[in-house]
Swiss-Prot record:
It comes from Homo sapiens (Human). It comes from the Eukaryota. Pfam families: DUF1308 (PF07000), DUF5614 (PF18474). This is UPF0415 protein C7orf25. InterPro entries: DUF1308, DUF5614. Belongs to the UPF0415 family.
Length: 421
């Protein structure tokens, strides 16, 4: 293939990938975090290729083959083949074995956060040679990168489970490397190809820690990745087993939402208070209670003493008879436990969004290894900004409104949600 036709092909691929990346971002309600970053990287690649085409930049033909496009294409294809993609090119912070702070880029975070994917576009030969110590200075082998992924994933539990790691190879992987990754607990996706060995004992091919760099060329002479000899083709796992957390911690905002008259049909009013009218409108568009019930189903419910005490106090002041009655039934379903905030929750610095009450409630959920249900997204974001990521289920808020209905204006019987637009 001539340099010009290769360039035209690369430009066509870049344009197609931009469309696919934009489509991916639209496929999830609220978009995919990092989707814009992926699109901008692809657009930068296209711009560069168009400059080459226009003769503004001169590059070698070999450089055309090794553009970032291969890796970006692998990311797009991975994201297209996975369920519940929440982010792409996500940067996670972690502490390495020496106690140094490091960052790790995860190409695709899928399965609601439970799966981390590294998409690899490099050829099996190059990857295998780097592993044998024959790469360029500073090249990190896939196995070393896998160790980083494991280290980081153990420090970033999702609902108290470590994310499952998949290394997705789009230009094959050698059989010994695939085996090593599997031993480490990492899933492999892609074509697994043979390594032709000229030794009687293939295990001698794997360099030990005591082997010096001088022995590298000898190793290279006795191993050859045979990409024609595909031993297995492994697709992405269709069902990744996730240990579903069966414990739920209820925040005050959730307790209120669960018993609110708004959640039980009392949303056809225009209230004196603007915020209540807005919540009623939200409820008419999207009911919250079915979402709460679905998440709470078959789970053990907890609430800390502070949350229940404050909830009762709010209920005594603002609650209507129906709301109080529902609260009595709800509290009977809940295990009320003493306040026991976790150590990492107590390390949070107080701010306008982080008060002692929220800290106690979320911290107790953390100690219980429970998912905290909440409408308090401000606290969750503020804690996240301080490096503390709580396991949460966030929903829309609903206030206690039953006692406000007497002064509210009922909506006409024929009023529909469409009338609001």
């Amino acid at each position: 293939m001539s340099a010009h036709s290769m360039l035209c092909e690369r430009i066509a691929i870049a344009k197609e990938l931009i469309k696919r990346a934009e489509s991916l971002s639209r496929s999830r309600k609220g978009g995919i975090e990092g989707g814009a970053k992926l699109c901008s990287k692809l657009k930068a690649e296209l711009k560069f290729l168009q400059k080459v085409e226009a003769g503004k930049v001169a590059i070698k033909e070999s450089h055309l083959q090794s553009t970032n496009l291969t890796h970006l294409r692998a990311i797009v294809e991975s994201a297209e083949n996975l369920e519940e993609v929440v982010s792409v090119l996500h940067v996670f912070g972690y502490t390495d074995t020496l106690g140094e702070k490091q960052t790790l880029v995860v190409d695709v975070v899928a399965n609601g956060g439970h799966t981390w994917v590294k998409a690899i576009g490099r050829k099996a030969e190059a990857l295998h040679n780097i592993w044998l110590g024959r790469g360029q200075y500073g090249d990190k082998s896939i196995i070393e990168q896998a160790e980083d992924f494991l280290q980081a994933s153990h420090q970033q539990p999702v609902q108290y489970s470590n994310p499952h790691i998949i290394f997705a190879f789009y230009n094959s992987v050698s059989s010994p490397m695939a085996e090593k990754l599997k031993e480490m607990g990492i899933s492999v996706r892609g074509d697994i190809v043979a390594v032709n060995a000229l030794l009687d004992h293939p295990e001698e091919l794997q360099p030990s820690e005591s082997e010096s760099d001088d022995e590298g060329p000898e190793l290279l002479q006795v191993t050859r990745v045979d990409r024609e000899n595909i031993l297995a083709s492994v697709a992405f796992p269709t069902e990744i087993k996730v240990d579903v957390c069966k414990r739920v911690n209820l925040d005050i905002t959730t307790l209120i939402t669960y018993v609110s008259a708004l959640s039980y049909g009392g949303c056809h009013f225009i209230f004196k208070e603007k915020v209540l009218t807005e919540q009623a409108e939200q409820e008419r568009k999207e009911q919250v209670l079915p979402q709460l019930e679905a998440f709470m189903k078959d789970k053990e419910l907890f609430a800390c003493e502070s949350a229940v005490k404050d909830f009762q106090s709010i209920l005594d002041t603002l609650g209507g008879p129906g709301e109080r009655e529902r609260a009595t039934v709800l509290i009977k379903r809940i295990n009320v436990v003493p306040d026991q905030p976790s150590e990492r929750a107590l390390r949070l610095v107080a701010s306008s969004k982080i008060n002692s009450r929220s800290l106690t409630i979320f911290g107790t959920g953390d100690t219980l290894k429970a998912i905290t249900m909440t409408a308090n997204s401000g606290f969750v974001r503020a804690a996240n900004n301080q490096g503390v990521k709580f396991s949460v289920f966030i929903h829309q808020p609903r206030a206690l409104t039953e006692s406000k209905e007497a002064l509210a204006t009922p909506l006409p019987k024929d009023y529909t949600t469409d009338s609001e637009h």
